[in-house]
Amino acid sequence: MPSGCRCLNLVCLLCILGATSQPARADDCSSHCDLAHGCCAPDGSCRCDPGWEGLHCERCVRMPGCQHGTCHQPWQCICHSGWAGKFCDKDEHICTSQSPCQNGGQCVYDGGGEYHCVCLPGFHGRGCERKAGPCEQAGFPCRNGGQCQDNQGFALNFTCRCLAGFMGAHCEVNVDDCLMRPCANGATCIDGINRFSCLCPEGFAGRFCTINLDDCASRPCQRGARCRDRVHDFDCLCPSGYGGKTCELVLPAPEPASVGTPQMPTSAVVVPATGPAPHSAGAGLLRISVKEVVRRQESGLGESSLVALVVFGSLTAALVLATVLLTLRAWRRGICPTGPCCYPAPHYAPARQDQECQVSMLPAGFPLSPDLPPEPGKTTAL
């Protein structure tokens, strides 16, 4: 080993690495360094082994957390007088020095720094700090994890501090999280503990079932048709000549009909095709408009209208016929509906019997016959 370093174990290997061939100095650290717990470095300093500390490596390192103790070897915690415990943090005289028991409780030392309190009736707790108040008397009635509060027993009544999702005097009621109807589009709300979930109908998704699933995402339409999304459905806007749900059908081309001999159902309406008029018979094309058929059928009289028209016509005809019959009957009896209609007796006969009654359709005073002009005030008109 070089003379410039004295190492006693592998911990001082650094001394070897830093050693030189120079002779030892007069102020060699071996005279004051505890070589049992360290070694001398080339610079004359004392390098301590692990677990030792101090200028000369004379002091052991205590256990971490040791409060009222010392050590003889590294990582020890030897308690001083009056202290106990693994970390020497327990006061053996706690019952006399600190009086930890409250409300008249008696402190009893158990050794090793431990103690317990003998509480007076009506009090409890490690230090007799709690009174047997409403919570204890009621048997701690708060449910579902609720905390009973009574100001450590000194309150007149207790209160329950409920966890989220519960309510009531004893936290016994589960709050209905579906009360505000958070689920949309007819979804079913399932209540939980401080939460809810939505059971979405087909075609919707999301936490609140507000997302309409795109039924066109799979591109169901064929023939290059445009897809229009709906609620749990879709429509295909097929190009001309194609049909079906996904435009999978090829529609037959319509055959033009002749003007002379049109072949069509009796309920169809034939509409001349737009464009210039044909120059010869049979050269024009006809177009069958289904919309026009429906429109004309809708604009016709319904069954109820026809029945009302027949009834009204029958009543009118019966009224006219009754009027005519009554008029003829009165005429045959020589009675006008509005009064006498014959000339006075002095012109034709001494009485009204067997006289010919002439009914005038002219205003009063107009001559009824060129041979017999009426006398003033003698003609009676209907």
From Swiss-Prot:
Residues 327-382 are cytoplasmic. Pfam families: EGF, EGF_DL_JAG, hEGF. The chain crosses the membrane at residues 306-326. GO terms for molecular function: calcium ion binding; identical protein binding. One of its GO terms (cellular component) is membrane. Keywords: Calcium, Disulfide bond, EGF-like domain, Glycoprotein, Membrane, Repeat, Signal, Transmembrane, Transmembrane helix. Residues 1-26 form the signal peptide. Residues 27-305 are extracellular. InterPro entries: EGF-like_Ca-bd_dom, EGF-like_CS, EGF-like_dom, EGF-type_Asp/Asn_hydroxyl_site, EGF_Ca-bd_CS, Notch_Cell-Fate_Det. Residues 27-58, 62-89, 91-129, 131-172, 174-210, 212-248 form the EGF-like domain. It is found in: Membrane. It is a single-pass type I membrane protein. Detected in a number of tissues including lung, brain, adrenal gland, testis, adult liver, placenta, ovary and thymus. Not detected in fetal liver or in adult spleen, muscle and heart. The keyword Transmembrane applies. Glycans are attached at N157. One of its GO terms (biological process) is negative regulation of Notch signaling pathway. It comes from the Eukaryota. Disulfide bonds join C29-C40, C33-C46, C48-C57, C66-C71, C79-C88, C95-C107, C101-C117, C119-C128, C135-C148, C142-C160, C162-C171, C178-C189, C183-C198, C200-C209, C216-C227, C221-C236, C238-C247. Regulates adipogenesis. This is Protein delta homolog 2.
